[in-house]
Design a protein with these regions (language model features):
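Alpha-helical transmembrane segments
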Residues: 159-172
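Hydrophobic H-region at the start of alpha-helical membrane spans
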Residues: 150-161
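Solvent-exposed, non-transmembrane regions of membrane-associated and secreted proteins
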Residues: 1-152, 173-175
Length: 178
């Protein structure tokens, strides 16, 4: 069943966390990697949370590669919210689990997804260490503004079409006047 929620405000993601990482579970949310620490926080813990990218039905961890060092994500378990600050972003081969080990005295969570998008030959690891929780941190800060190229292109196309129509109308009026 569901054990908690992972939320990543900077990329607008909030997913339920389920026990295990079966395909069935990853179709509906994030999975807790069996063998890693439970995502309840505490010294000398390292929880690994994994989710798919680019499912037709849901965004999941599609934009995980947009996270930067210093961004925060949150885990909510048993009514408690824990904040983590991203401190390492790394791409590894699927069998390389070195970066998922417990580090003595540390409280860590690593978010994992497949990469590169569509090929899935490697794993993107985004690690965070526990920091003090402030409710204000969960407000979505548009830190990584995506340039909406599609919108810009449509606006430019509209402007060009308007200018073109205007020029055509002017030419037609001139020709009528002769």
């Amino acid at each position: 069943g569901m054990m908690g929620i992972v939320s990543i405000p900077s990329i607008d993601v909030e997913l339920p966390i389920y026990h295990y990482t079966t395909n069935e579970i990853l179709e509906k949310g994030a999975g807790h990697l069996f063998g890693s620490s439970l995502p309840v926080g505490g010294k000398s813990t390292h929880s690994v949370i994994t989710a798919h990218r680019g499912l037709p039905s849901a965004k999941m961890f599609t934009d995980l590669d947009e996270l930067r060092n210093g961004d925060k994500f949150f885990i909510e378990v048993l009514g408690q919210k824990i904040a983590y600050k991203v401190d390492r972003i790394k791409t590894v081969k699927p069998e390389d689990t070195q970066d998922m080990k417990i580090i003595e005295g540390e409280d860590l969570v690593t978010l994992v997804t497949c990469t590169p998008y569509g090929q899935n030959t490697h794993r993107l690891l985004v690690r965070g260490h526990r920091v003090a929780y402030n409710a204000g941190d969960e407000v979505k800060e548009p830190t990584h503004r995506r340039i909406p190229w599609a919108h810009i292109l449509c606006i430019m196309l509209g402007v060009f079409l308007a200018v073109d129509c205007y020029m055509l109308a002017v030419r037609l009026r001139r020709n009528k006047g002769r």
